[in-house]
């Protein structure tokens, strides 16, 4: 019998870090493994200055993000041809199957609460190594544009 077989409210103190397939370090949260979740996971993420995830998608699961602090650019699309800027207080939605990656171009960390409809969190993560060269080009262009806007 599982330790989560009886329905109960559970409180989790997020203390344990783990490395996600995406190349970022997450703080463990609500998941099938920690509380017996059946249809959702929630964890904390901090992206350091200059950090970014690997290009990836979540095969069958949607993602909702609440940005606590800092600002991130999320590249997305089949060729990472689009991007959105999110700042503290913003909510971000990423549909299932959409290639994407967050990047921190600022000088301070980004903190966010990440929620997915994947109770095992990393289960449906699919890395997209074929997009990494494109990601590097896009990030370099964004850095250049940011430097240029600061100088003008």
Predicted stretch roles:
Residues 26, 42-46, 64, 83, ...:
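Conserved hydrophobic/aromatic beta-strand scaffold that supports enzyme active sites
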Residues 52, 61-88:
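A short beta-strand-loop-beta hairpin characteristic of the jelly-roll/cupin
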Residues 87-88, 96-123:
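Ligand-binding loop in jelly-roll beta-barrel domains
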């Amino acid at each position: 019998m599982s330790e989560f077989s009886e329905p109960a409210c559970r409180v989790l103190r997020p203390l344990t870090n783990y490395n996600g397939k995406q190349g970022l370090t997450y703080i463990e949260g609500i998941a099938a493994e920690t509380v017996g979740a059946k249809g959702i996971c929630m964890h904390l993420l901090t992206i350091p200055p200059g950090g970014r995830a690997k290009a990836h998608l979540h095969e069958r699961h949607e993602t909702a993000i609440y940005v606590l602090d800092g600002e991130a650019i999320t590249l997305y699309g089949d060729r990472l041809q689009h991007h959105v800027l999110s700042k503290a207080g913003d909510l971000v939605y990423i549909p299932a199957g959409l290639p994407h990656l967050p990047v921190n171009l600022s000088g301070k960390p980004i903190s966010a609460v990440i929620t997915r409809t994947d109770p095992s969190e990393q289960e449906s993560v699919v890395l997209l190594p074929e997009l990494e060269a494109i990601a590097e080009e896009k990030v370099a262009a964004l850095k250049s544009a940011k430097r240029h806007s600061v100088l003008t």
